[in-house]
UniProtKB/Swiss-Prot annotation:
This is NADH-quinone oxidoreductase subunit I. Residues 53-83, 94-123 form the 4Fe-4S ferredoxin-type domain. NDH-1 is composed of 14 different subunits. Subunits NuoA, H, J, K, L, M, N constitute the membrane sector of the complex. Its cofactor is [4Fe-4S] cluster. It comes from Bartonella quintana (strain Toulouse).
Amino acid sequence: MSGLIQAAKSLLLLEFVSAFFLAMRQFFSPKPTINYPYEKGVVSQRFRGEHALRRYPNGEERCIACKLCEAICPAQAITIEAGPRGNDGTRRTVRYDIDMVKCIYCGFCQEACPVEAIVEGPNFEFATEMREELYYDKEKLLMNGDRWEREIARNILIDAPYR
C-alpha cells in the first residue's frame, strides 16, 4: 500500500506543489528588512551605544572622579585625571578620555558609576574616516551627554526597576 501512495505522490508532484505554495506565501508576506538609512529601526532602551558624560540639571557635571569606571574597564579604554573642584575640597575630572577603538561596549563603566555620570547612549551612528576622531575627550563626552540627555534620562528611568 505504501508503494501505491508513494507513486501517487510522485505522479501528482505533491512536494513540488507544497514547496511552490510555501514560496508564494513568503513572497507576498511583509518584508522584515528596513531601508536603512532612510528608515530607522527601533532601538532597545538597554542599547549600549556611544558614550556620554551627563550633567546635573543645574549644569554641573556629574562625575566625581572616583575612577571606578577606569578601574573596572576590561579594555583599559578610559583615562581619568582628577583635580580639586573648588574650595570645598571635592574632586572633579580634569581629563576624561575614552579610546573608542579599544572599547568593547560592555557597559561595566555605566554599572560602576555611583552617580550615573558615564552612560552609553542610544547613538549608534558615529562612524568616521579618521581614527583620531574615535579618541573622545571630556568636551566631546559632555557634548554627547547634552545632545542625548532626554533619551538617556528616559532609558535610565525605564530600566531603573531592573537595576
